[in-house]
Amino acid sequence: LHFWLPSTYANAPGPVAALFAIMSKVGIYAIIRFFTLIFPPDSITGTVATDLILPAALITLTLGQLGVLGTASLTRLAAFAAIASIGTLAISIARFDVPGLTAGLYYMIHSTLISAALFLVVDLIAARRGGDIWLRPRPPIRDIGLVSALFFATAIAMVGLPPLSGFLGKLMILNATAGDGWRV
């Protein structure tokens, strides 16, 4: 996930990358359904979700955020942001209780829509600029105001700044993970 997915997203057209971002969240929903049916929390295998998903979620979140900081391509930036949102979502799923799953489902809706929107906006920028490498000087874009406002709005929504829904979703995840001795 951490190595092949950013390249796949970066080389796909914007609408295809947006669809891929949606499909990766469908995989997370499948994990929720699988673990709630096969490994209920009150059974002997109830800790399997936490033991398996939490370390993978923390690694995914860390590598996604490091990728966001280290890339020069806008499409790879959007890809790593989508990976980091999968890690954040998986942390709430690893909680494997009602507050954690509720927070995860709320955040899943937010991150699915914002990830898809970010890929579409980045594709719009790349099409108008002639490339997605933001460090390389390019000619200025006409009507940059609307495009930059769209990028700014989707970027801060992806980060989860208030008053947008990503902030509420991440706050719900933090509240869900604060109980039972979990260190936030």
For the regions a protein language model found, what residue spans apply to each?
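Short helix-boundary/re-entrant hairpin motifs in multi-pass inner-membrane proteins
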Residues: 1-52, 79
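Hydrophobic alpha-helical membrane segments of integral membrane proteins
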Residues: 2, 19-20, 66-83, 102-109
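Interfacial and helix-entry/exit segments of alpha-helical transmembrane bundles
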Residues: 3-21, 79-85, 115-116, 121-183
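Internal transmembrane alpha-helices of multipass membrane proteins
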Residues: 13, 26, 49-96
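Transmembrane alpha-helical core residues of multi-pass small-molecule transporters
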Residues: 24, 36, 59-60, 84-87, ...
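Helix-coil boundary and interhelical linker segments in multi-pass alpha-helical membrane proteins
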Residues: 32-49, 89-106, 176-184
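Structural signal for membrane-spanning alpha-helices in multi-pass inner-membrane proteins
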Residues: 32-36, 64-65, 89-93, 118-123, ...
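Structural signature of hydrophobic alpha-helical transmembrane segments
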Residues: 44-60, 106-113
